[in-house]
UniProtKB/Swiss-Prot annotation:
Region of interest: NLS 2: 178-184
Compositional bias segments (type: Basic and acidic residues): 83-94, 166-179
Motif (Nuclear localization signal (NLS) 2): 178-184
Protein name in the entry: High mobility group protein B1
Organism encoding this protein: Gallus gallus
Region of interest: Involved in intramolecular interaction with K-3: 196-210
């Protein structure tokens, strides 16, 4: 199911993801009470997958094809909630949010997992990373947490400066708008004065003509 919308169809799985799922289920049946060493288990699955013949992999490839059809069919009937397609405007110059300790950990280990499990789907890679993080000792997490804290501190300073600059720019726009409005008003007043002067001149000329006629 989708993270934001519970009605969103579940993402399609790869043939390798189905294979790993089967291995996990087999392991649980054989060792229901045993805790799984995720790293070792993943390595064994990867090695086993590499040695399998095309015929053995065929079963999982068929499962992946069927799941792909299921996903495509569900997506055709899926209507996203209103407003989901609309994206908020993001200023490209705004400071980017800092990554979390877990995100930094993922950035480091994601290429390794992809290398060990080339057929793994994005969702399963994320799941593996989550399990690895949960099994990581607090001391081993510290370097990532320290780096994340430093990046957060820098971000807070940058965003404060960015917002302050935004207020200054907004203030400049207001002043510029006011000056423009004032200038326009002055120009209109000057035009009115010119029209009044022209009217006065016309009246004077008419009076002079009347005087000439009287003579």
């Amino acid at each position: 199911m989708g993270k934001g919308d519970p009605k969103k169809p579940r993402g399609k799985m790869s043939s390798y993801a189905f294979f790993v799922q089967t291995c996990r289920e087999e392991h649980k049946k054989k060792h229901p009470d045993a805790s799984v060493n995720f790293s070792e288990f993943s390595k064994k699955c990867s090695e086993r997958w590499k040695t399998m013949s095309s015929k053995e992999k065929g079963k999982f490839e068929d499962m992946a094809k069927a799941d792909k059809l299921r996903y495509e069919k569900e997506m055709k009937n899926y209507v996203p909630p209103k407003g989901e397609t609309k994206k908020k405007f993001k200023d490209p110059n705004a400071p980017k949010r800092p990554p979390s300790a877990f995100f930094l950990f993922c950035s480091e280990f994601r290429p390794k997992i992809k290398g060990e499990h080339p057929g793994l789907s994005i969702g399963d890679v994320a799941k593996k990373l989550g399990e690895m993080w949960n099994n990581t000792a607090a001391d081993d997490k510290q370097p990532y947490e320290k780096k994340a804290a430093k990046l957060k501190e820098k971000y807070e300073k940058d965003i404060a400066a960015y917002r302050a600059k935004g207020k200054v720019d907004a203030g400049k726009k207001v002043v510029a708008k006011a000056e423009k409005s004032k200038k326009k008003k002055e120009e209109e007043e000057d035009e009115d004065e010119d029209e009044e002067d022209e009217e006065d001149e016309e009246e004077e000329e008419e009076e002079e003509e009347d005087d000439d006629d009287d003579e």
